[in-house]
Curated annotation (Swiss-Prot):
The keyword Iron applies. One of its GO terms (biological process) is hydrogen peroxide catabolic process. GO terms for molecular function: haptoglobin binding; heme binding; metal ion binding; organic acid binding; oxygen binding; oxygen carrier activity; peroxidase activity. Heme b binds at residues 64, 93. The keyword Heme applies. Belongs to the globin family. It comes from Trematomus hansoni (Striped rockcod). This is Hemoglobin subunit beta. Keywords: Heme, Iron, Metal-binding, Oxygen transport, Transport. PROSITE patterns: GLOBIN (PS01033). The gene is hbb. Residues 3-147 form the Globin domain. The lineage of its organism: Eukaryota, Metazoa, Chordata, Craniata, Vertebrata. One of its GO terms (cellular component) is haptoglobin-hemoglobin complex.
């Protein structure tokens, strides 16, 4: 079980309460697909993923990026039981979709980069530490079914 300080809980809740899901989600997933092109294989039904411009303007990518962030919001609401919160999603990604669990970390890094760019100076080291701890716990939970 993960220990969360009151400060970490506050930072994470604050980030998600102010996050523009419609902006951050599409940008983060698009960045992941452009920077790590091998991740595109999981999105073959999304249409044009042939170049950065096509990815960045792809409505399916944008919608899934938003969906991912709303999925993270479930973790924020269940910080004391993140593993159980993502158990079904872990099973889906491992057994049906066969997603390499390393890709969850890549996407979490892209989310962090996009969020940091959006928050600017407000994305302090303390904020980054709490946010990345949260994402690491979620990534671990999503990878549970693979172990």
């Amino acid at each position: 079980m993960v220990e969360w300080t009151d400060k970490e809980r506050s930072i994470i809740s604050d980030i998600f309460s102010h996050m523009d899901y419609d902006d951050i989600g599409p940008k983060a997933l698009s960045r992941c697909l452009v920077v790590y092109p091998w991740t595109q294989r999981y999105f073959s039904g999304f249409g044009n993923l042939y170049n950065a411009e096509g990815i960045m303007s792809n409505a399916n990518v944008a919608a899934h990026g938003i969906k991912v962030l709303h999925g993270l919001d479930r973790g924020v609401k269940n910080m004391d039981n993140i593993a159980a919160t993502y158990a079904d999603l872990s099973t889906l990604h491992s057994e049906k979709l066969h997603v390499d669990p390393d890709n969850f970390k890549l996407l979490s890094d892209c989310i962090t980069i996009v969020l940091a760019a959006k928050m600017g100076h407000a994305f302090t080291a303390e904020t980054q530490g709490a946010f990345q701890k949260f994402l690491a716990v979620v990534v671990s939970a999503l990878g549970k079914q693979y172990h």
